[in-house]
């Protein structure tokens, strides 16, 4: 991958964000997702690359495009693997709430873990805590370590947790330490990445979310030098989700084994989930969030706010783009 390709990857998430933003607040989460998928796929098709979707909208028979294994791009050029979530936080987008974004991770071939559509226990923390906090430790232990690493009192720490029934005990434990809990309804990718930047007011992400999004978070945190660990969750009693109402622990283990995952309890580091030589994260806000603004529509232009993080040159670039409409008469500076 080179800088030209990275610029095109940025445009992929910008176009997906704009497409979804036209449906923000209309209560149409499926339509918003479909619009983002179509826009992302269309822009990817214009890139000189041999692209491949390793994490996408589902298996080939489950999704019309951006399905797992789909080839994208011109068919010539560098081989690139993608993990995509064209509209992360579809409910947030549908209800015009904070935190929805178009997001992807990219790497050279074989550089992204092909995560199954399972749940994942996650731990994200700032670079100063990398290798010191550990997903095997209790929330209390990790909070005390985090306090020491950041030079903050425990009461000054904010821990982000998905607002789910399965996290009732975790939230109680965090609050018992004196740390603050910030529950989120959806969209833990942006929350995880925010832990990698000072000044966001977010210091740690704990709890269980979707495994595919864990790979995207890991790619960003690896490029930032932040801490990220993930462990697949296969026990329905732990996941506590209606989606697994008919599943069993033994059945899920068998499913993982069929996918080639025999060590079902393995703890994955960021460098294992995103192991490529060149790893890129790109995200563009659909609605306002922790890291960037959402799409803004104006008479003569559309504005997007995005972030690209790359191991190629060890940079994190925040980009505000003005997409000028045909026949525009005047463009405000901001």
Curated annotation (Swiss-Prot):
The keyword Manganese applies. Pfam families: FBPase_glpX (PF03320). Its EC number is 3.1.3.11, 3.1.3.37. It catalyses: beta-D-fructose 1,6-bisphosphate + H2O = beta-D-fructose 6-phosphate + phosphate; D-sedoheptulose 1,7-bisphosphate + H2O = D-sedoheptulose 7-phosphate + phosphate. Keywords: Calvin cycle, Carbohydrate metabolism, Hydrolase, Manganese, Metal-binding. Mn(2+) 1 binds at residues 33, 57. One of its GO terms (molecular function) is metal ion binding. Pathway: Carbohydrate biosynthesis; Calvin cycle. One of its GO terms (biological process) is reductive pentose-phosphate cycle. Substrate binds at residues 88-90, 119, 164-166, 186-188. Mn(2+) 2 binds at residues 85, 88, 213. Its cofactor is Mn(2+). GO terms for cellular component: cytosol. Belongs to the FBPase class 2 family. Catalyzes the hydrolysis of fructose 1,6-bisphosphate (Fru 1,6-P2) and sedoheptulose 1,7-bisphosphate (Sed 1,7-P2) to fructose 6-phosphate and sedoheptulose 7-phosphate, respectively. Homotetramer. This is D-fructose 1,6-bisphosphatase class 2/sedoheptulose 1,7-bisphosphatase.
